[in-house]
Amino acid sequence: MLKEVEAVRYDRKMRNGKTTPFLMACEKETGDEVELVAKFSKGCEDHCGGLICEAISAALAKDLGLPIPCPYVVNISPEFIATVAEPADRMFLEQSCSKGFGSERLPDSYSTWVSPSGKISDSLLASARSVIAFDSLFVNPDRRAENPNLMFNGRQIAVIDHEMALRQDMILFWKAPWTSGAFESPSSLEKHLLYRITKGSVLSDFNEFLQKLAMITDARIEEYASAIPID
């Protein structure tokens, strides 16, 4: 589940990302440090709402076995914000909610997804199927060629950025994925970044994903909500 960490060192603004994410070191309850890519409400279109969607999506993704960096709730105190030397970045944090969302930084071996030219391994194909099933079911339209939100190290993928998920109200003509004609809409499955390599999959290929989905109870969903800070 989502654990809360305290921001203790600001490193820099990330080069990419429409939400203006930052690289920073955070301290766990144990005293250990973890390096995170963190985003805050000032950079999200829906402010705190976008962070809530991101956090719940990340918790769901972990339970469903998707390859996602470990997620955290990031607390930024006034004392921490005061240590940020860059005035624009300091003001950005001052204008954000005191809680942000952070993902553990991936190793440098990961870069933006490039579709493999050769044979795709069974493990990579299984991960790709889980990702496309997740994005379809939980209404994430934000994994396309122009905005991959998918990292790759040549063997494994990692999914990032889910602040647009769970927002079917923002998609014109959206239909639930289990209804007829759902993928004939403007958010069609064919536009998904992983459609080409998963095309031809049959229902039985998604058995593992569906089994994990069936294990997510109402009580577990309530735990997701409880992990979101009220303030």
What feature does the model see in each segment?
Residues 1-114, 137-141, 154-155, 162:
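Conserved ATP-binding subdomain of kinase catalytic cores across diverse folds
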Residues 55-59, 89-90, 120-125, 171, ...:
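Short, low-complexity, polar/charged sequence segments that are solvent-exposed and flexible
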Residues 82-89, 93, 117-125, 186-187, ...:
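Short, structured coil/loop segments at alpha-helix boundaries
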